[in-house]
Structure formats: C-alpha cells, structure tokens
Amino acid sequence: MSKATGFIKEFRDFAVKGNAIDLAVGVIIGAAFGKIVDSLVKDVVMPLVNFILGGSVDFSNKFLVLSMPDGYTGPMTYADLTKAGANVLAWGNFITIIINFVLLAFVIFWMVKAIYSARRKEEAAPEAPAAPPEDVTVLREIRDLLKDKQGS
C-alpha cells in the first residue's frame, strides 16, 4: 500500500469516527445558535434596555472619532466615517458584542448544567439486579431441598 492510499484511509477513518462528526455538528449548531443570541440581544434585550432607561440607547452606534480625513464634510455616522477612512473607535459595537458573549456563555452554561444533571440522574438510578442464570437457580433449589432433608 502506498503512502497516499494509507493517508487517505487514515483520513477516512478519522472523518467517520463519531468524535469528528460530533465536532462538525457542534460547530454548525454553535454558529446557528450564535445568530439566535445576536438576534436576542438586538431585538429583545436592547429594546428592553431602551424602555427601562427611557430613551434610545443603541450601543452599536456609539463611537469615538480619533482622527478625521482632511477636508471631510460628509455625514458623521460610523459607516460613513469608516468608509471615508476616519480612525474610529467603535466602543458601542464592542459593548454589544460583550453582551452577546455573556448571554451566549450563560445559555451554554445552563444547557451543559442541564445535560450533566440528566446524566447524573441516569447514573444514580440503580439498575435492577440481573436475574441469576438458570443453572444457579437450579443449584439453589437443590441446595434448599438438601437442607430441608437434613433438617427433617
């Protein structure tokens, strides 16, 4: 067998193993779940923060202009400034990403905790003792009969 076919066989064995497939599924689900958390922050959490604070608190549009291009007279929005080449510190977007991360970590923590709790319950459930094999049962019956005969 050549080195190339050996490498291909080794790669196939690795790719078909459960761990590699589980990892791939986890990455795909994690990416989709990240989008859900991002939507949760943008569409649920931030509107609630705005409502509680009684104003429009949109962290994603908060930034600090560090330097402007010479002669710039356009709009002072983050998108326009960065497009024009301004040096902009987007601290609001960073805060939004931190909120996303904290929520994602919190939800994953609770999911892992629930999974471990379910596993512990499965492990803690005592298994019913297995019935003894038939030959052992017959030998016990013979023993009991012999004890009864000796006792009488």
From Swiss-Prot:
It is found in: Cell inner membrane. GO terms for molecular function: mechanosensitive monoatomic ion channel activity. The keyword Transmembrane applies. Keywords: Cell inner membrane, Cell membrane, Ion channel, Ion transport, Membrane, Transmembrane, Transmembrane helix, Transport. The chain crosses the membrane at residues 21-41, 44-64, 92-112. One of its GO terms (cellular component) is plasma membrane. It comes from the Bacteria. It holds the Pfam family MscL. It is a multi-pass membrane protein. InterPro entries: MS_channel (IPR001185), MSC/AndL (IPR037673), MscL_channel (IPR036019). Channel that opens in response to stretch forces in the membrane lipid bilayer. May participate in the regulation of osmotic pressure changes within the cell. Homopentamer. Belongs to the MscL family. This is Large-conductance mechanosensitive channel. The gene is mscL.
